[in-house]
Amino acid sequence: MESIMKVAMDKAAEQLIQQFGFDYLQQQLQLQHQNQHNSSPQQPQHQQLEPENEHLTYQYQQSKPTHMQQLACNYQPRHSTTTSSPSSTHSLASGGGSSSNSSNSSSSDSSSINISHISNISNISNIGNISNSNHSNAAYSLAVHSYQKQIESPANPSHVPHHQMDLSPLSENGSPNGTPGAQTPTATASGNTAAALASAAAAAAAATSGGNGSSITNCNSNNSSSSSNAQQQLQLGNYKTNSCWCYGESVCSGIEVEIENNNNNHIHHGETTYHMKILVPAVASGAIIGKGGETIASLQKDTGARVKMSKSHDFYPGTTERVCLITGSTEAIMVVMEFIMDKIREKPDLTNKIVDTDSKQTQERDKQVKILVPNSTAGMIIGKGGAFIKQIKEESGSYVQISQKPTDVSLQERCITIIGDKENNKNACKMILSKIVEDPQSGTCLNVSYADVSGPVANFNPTGSPYATNQNAINSSTASLNSTLGTTIGGANSAASLLVNGTGINLSINLGSPNPAPNLAVATQLLEHIKVAMRGSGYSETVTNEVVAALSVLAKYGVLGMGVGVSHTNGAHSTLGNFLGVTTLDQQTAAAASAATASNVFGAVGQVNLEQYAAAVASAAAASRPTQSQLDAAAVQFDPFRHLGSATAPAATPVSLNNNSFGLTATTGTATTAQLGGLSKSPTPGDLSSKDSKNVEVPEVIIGAILGPSGRSLVEIQHVSGANVQISKKGIFAPGTRNRIVTITGQPSAIAKAQYLIEQKINEEETKRARQIPLTTVVN
């Protein structure tokens, strides 16, 4: 601030001195004309000086006003209530005075003219023998001294932008003129500068009081009239500070700027925005986005919300559903939610059978809403003792369940599944959204891509396996999804389970008897997922439609069969067998058989020596758990091929292995391809109609042995056996007992394997506990 005041005072002194010189020249010219009539001897000298004085006067009049004069006249600072103009400045500074001789010289061009003015004025004063030259007082000397000091150390105002304010004209209604590209002038004057000008003018007026009173009065009157005219012409009120940059708000405005900033934030940002993340089936996401993104763009424009969708092959871990993030006000979020719910109803998903354990009724995907919330928000939705989630169920009429909390630190979200009618689901979503609004941490998980998440993740269907294995995007599927497809179409080893994974599908042609009643509804859904998989792989829309149309014709007449052939199982996709419910031993058996008959893949017969075959299978199964002998003992009655190939039943008679991908049959020796059904013929939809189910009671105190840490044991049992394993909810027991009900669904062989693995887990846990009892006794 001191530097600003210093520059302002120096500039004011410069202007005053210039004005003094102009007024003094006029007075001296008048005195010269009077002296010409009174004293004739001095007339030649006056004639010599008169042209020079007139030249100096003309030069001063033609000089441009200074930067300070223009700014002080045209623009009023934001926080100053006074105005200034060149005329008013002249009127304040008007007055006669005499100057002493100046011996200082100027280094700048702009200052040299003013010095010459002062020196010439001094000469004229000496020649005219004016009595007023003796009345120079200390105040005027101080003003001259300030001007000389300014010459010695010139300051450039352009290098002192400490408090620069952008000014923009006001319109008639008082609002700033927001014309793009308009350049606004800059004001460097302030109230302090105006005060400095006034004080300097007062000092100059006191210094020049004396014999020039009449001329001073005339000058003051003229200057004051010109000042009033200039102020009338300039509409100073039409300018208002629009923005101010300085070293801090406290320098310029204080509370006033703070209020304006708050108002601007309210205008620009509007209502507070919130975030809701939901899961959308892949088959319905295209309808939400629209052709070229037109639908989603129109939705965002109409609602004012932002809708962000994950990429076509980027699914939420453990599912085949894309992630949709909605950002906006609560009203906009609910409008978008209703739109998405309608699109899901128009595009039914393959996972259309999810069992509600409370009502024991099957629910379709179009009656579900899946919401992802952070762990903190999930806790608020559950409420103390489950009070709020119970309230949601009662008031909305929808079934609501939250997935288990994941242990993986990379995934801090839980999935809320809402099942019911559209209106009921909307009411439930509103209640959930109210908790999202209350939670300050609800906006911590705003990502839509989960490509970097690995390990077990929360299952979207909490009634089944609590965790699902995460694979790459096109192969992502939950255990619940696999089991649902298997039970719907005919088991875990079904074409539906095969097709969901997108890759590794063998399409076989059924040349046997026609299928009397092909399941066209299932075929349509399978073909829809083939279409999604092909689009994700980069196929064009034309190619995809042609391929799906051809497959639909084959499926219509029951000619199309889907399954896994030996050639594909031989390492073509390492994780495919697990997803299809094919056990590790089945893959090892198929791999050994394929290696032995590699030269006869498309031939009718391939000779395999069972001794060599048994040795290959035994070596392949040595590293796996459970061992081959244990599984043989559990499933010997269901799988004669594995029984023949076991180490306990060697045979020297070669057995033919038909590896024909078209399902042709042939017999050689004592064994037929009918005994090798899993490897000799790809199943058709007509072959996948049988399923079975079995309930096993497990004590409540030991049910954790089946679940395992983070549910991994249950996932392992399902993958190894190929069966679907469901455990009753906590608190639901078999009648009259404290035993939880474990339901095993699948093919008979898969059920037997799963039951054996469950019993093995229970025995291991009981043995472990029995060993801990003596140790506890000894310690005590």
UniProtKB/Swiss-Prot annotation:
Q: Which InterPro entries match?
A: KH-I_NOVA_rpt1, KH-I_NOVA_rpt2, KH-I_NOVA_rpt3, KH_dom, KH_dom_type_1, KH_dom_type_1_sf
Tissue pattern of expression reads:
Expressed in the central nervous system in mushroom body neurons (at protein level).
Keywords for this entry?
Cytoplasm, mRNA processing, mRNA splicing, Nucleus, Repeat, RNA-binding
Region span, Disordered: 31-50, 76-113, 150-190, 674-693
Q: Which residues form the KH domain?
A: 273-340, 366-432, 691-758
In residue numbers, the region (Required for RNA binding) covers 686-776
Following inactivation of the gene, the phenotype reported is: In both embryo and larva, results in irregularly shaped salivary glands with bulges of variable sizes, leading to greater distances between neighboring nuclei and decreased apical secretion.
Listed Low complexity bias regions: 79-91, 99-113, 176-190
> Can you say what this protein is called?
RNA-binding protein Pasilla
